[in-house]
Amino acid sequence: MSNQLSPKPPVNPIVMGKIGSAYGIRGWLRVFSSTEDAESIFDYQPWFIQSKSGWQLVEIEGWKYHNQDLIIKVKGTDDRDAANLLTNCEIVVDSSQLPDLGEGDYYWKDLMGCQVVTVAGYELGKVIDMMETGSNDVMVIKANLKDAFGVKERLVPFLTEQVVKRVDLSTQTIEVDWDPGF
């Protein structure tokens, strides 16, 4: 009997990537990483996926690059059929594993659900998603139902100082210098 404790399911889960399609016939799978450097996803262990019965531990046997794809071998997944069962599952870890960020840097997960208000006090709506465009991140903001401009969704660049004037995570508020009609 092993004295080693099994990893605990995430208390504060965060999605770090997604398992893609099967690769080959020996149970390898493509992985799509949400980390800045694709292979940094392996720095965060253990991995979990959500199944019908709850959290399921995913143990990595190995990983490598194949062309531009990152592929993994999951312990106990030895053929294509077993690999296909994991396709499209989100890779989740506990957010306590994430490093602390410096002043003015934020994890996207912390910005989700924040109310976005202009410097003039107009409520633009809530952040429902973030997008990476290459030059800068963009907030996807779901407008309030009674938006005076008839807008349902806004895309606002997350440019500190230029557009984003203040972020207060304790009150879940982001203040922006942005024209509500845009």
Swiss-Prot record:
Pfam families: PRC_RimM, RimM. It comes from the Bacteria. It is found in: Cytoplasm. An accessory protein needed during the final step in the assembly of 30S ribosomal subunit, possibly for assembly of the head region. Essential for efficient processing of 16S rRNA. May be needed both before and after RbfA during the maturation of 16S rRNA. It has affinity for free ribosomal 30S subunits but not for 70S ribosomes. Belongs to the RimM family. It comes from Pectobacterium carotovorum subsp. carotovorum (strain PC1). Residues 102-182 form the PRC barrel domain. This is Ribosome maturation factor RimM. GO terms for cellular component: cytoplasm; ribosome. Binds ribosomal protein uS19. The PRC barrel domain binds ribosomal protein uS19. Keywords: Chaperone, Cytoplasm, Ribosome biogenesis, rRNA processing. One of its GO terms (biological process) is ribosomal small subunit biogenesis. One of its GO terms (molecular function) is ribosome binding.
